[in-house]
Amino acid sequence: MTKIEDGAVVLFQGDSITDCGRNREIGTDLGRGYALIASALFASKYPEKQVQFINRGISGNRVKDLQQRWQEDCLDLNPTWVSIYIGINDTWRRYDRNDPTSVEAFAEGYRDLIVRTKETLDAKLILVEPFVLPVPEDRKRWREDLDPKINAVRELAREFETLYVPLDGMFAAASTKAPSAYWAPDGVHPSPAGHALIANAWLEAAQA
């Protein structure tokens, strides 16, 4: 049986992968990615639970951006479940804008989100690990920056006993069945098939 309770409010938080073109003017819009797919599959399987899903992902966000809007876009919404998927932009900005985020600052900011959530809400947490695939070729260089951040997220999940969605290994494994670009054309933003992978892994973590 799923861990998600009757009448739950599930909040998806993150960057462009979560945002995925959602209409900001419509508070119930879930975008076109994994948040929509996961919520649709869940709702079709558990209609009696009447679970509400909310998407507040914003394209380009880093951990520090989530920190700045956490009160309004998380705590004030009073969710019973909080799904956090952040980190790839904390790596990307080092390479495209020479604006790096140290692994220490990343972990500290992420910890702050978790602590504030736990102190304010009686909410369960799902942490989604960031991933990158080697398309185009220059993405391979990103591993030195991203890998320690992935480890930081894993350590936080262990420390706070959250649910966890291990995307990096999953996308690597999927890339043995079809080319990396099939799952994420730019190595970062998932294709529809990639979003379906995330949605299924998210539902699995929630035992749904």
Give the predicted meaning of each segment.
Residues 3-6, 37-52, 61-208:
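Alpha-helical cap/lid subdomain in secreted, periplasmic
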Residues 58:
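Conserved active-site regions of diverse hydrolases
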